[in-house]
Amino acid sequence: LSEWALVYENYDPGQERLREALCTLGNGYFATRGAAPEAVAGEVHYPGTYLAGGYNRLRSEIAGQEVENEDLVNLPNWLPLTFRIDGGDWFDLEQVQILDYHQSLDLHRAVLERSVRFADAEQRISRLSQRRLVHMGMPHLAALATTLVAENWSGSVEFRSALDGRVVNDGVARYRGLGNRHLEPLRVEEHDSETLFLKMRTTQSRREIALAARSRLYLNGEHQELQPECERKPDYIAHHFRLDMTEGDTLRLEKCVSLYSSRDRAITECGTDALNTLHRAGTFEELLASHSEHWLQLWRRFDIGIGENNGEQGERHALILRLHILHMLQTSSP
């Protein structure tokens, strides 16, 4: 038990939606639920990204009556990142043997971390480590670092990094009879061999949402300049990166995302600003350092201590209190 980390040492599908809510990261401009990057919306997972003030209305017919509902729109999912080995199935935590699992929300830095050691059906053992942030000082930026270690195998690895606009508002069972598709596609584009672009628009409030994503791969610390295959649909775009790994290799993929809205102040055009901000963004470690510094300053002002020497119960109370403070700060964006 730590006063500064919300820790899970096992994977429990029945608890995933609760954990995703508790592990939400945000900065007052937008927030992203703590769903795994490979997660697909369903009974177990519900990926969600939400913009402050990002509402939209839909009309539905219920029992012969027209009903109008207003929702905070689930925005395009910037997280999608998965992989497969030797052309097999895409990574699915429920289809592998989990040898070790650790997930931690670092409250001090507002960083979500996950480490999974697993064996697949071919008994290939791998270690997957991920860190994620939604930048407190640069409100339009988020980043995800993924590391894959081949422990006892060699082979071809394919990574798929995507922006997904096929999302709906479907997180609350009792509202599933209402209209839930709040977004319509405007444009998808492969900007270069590392950068993808997606623009959507809310159907009634007519707010445009632009996302730009940059994916960079490093094999054993060396930047890999690859020519990925691009997969695109009207509301979805992905890069497929393929390269070979040998036993003991470490492959790292850094995904940085910029998100803008047409209602943002002092911008030229949301798509242009999304791309410009992304191009100026540093590496994951650089973003992590500046993000952590902002949180250090916040905790100096807002931390509340519970007397020392209170044992495990005192640590638990301190953890709960700091978790609430973290979410308050992520919402208010001081």
Describe the function of each predicted region.
Residues 1-334:
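Acidic/polar, glycine-enriched structural segments that form the non-catalytic walls/loops
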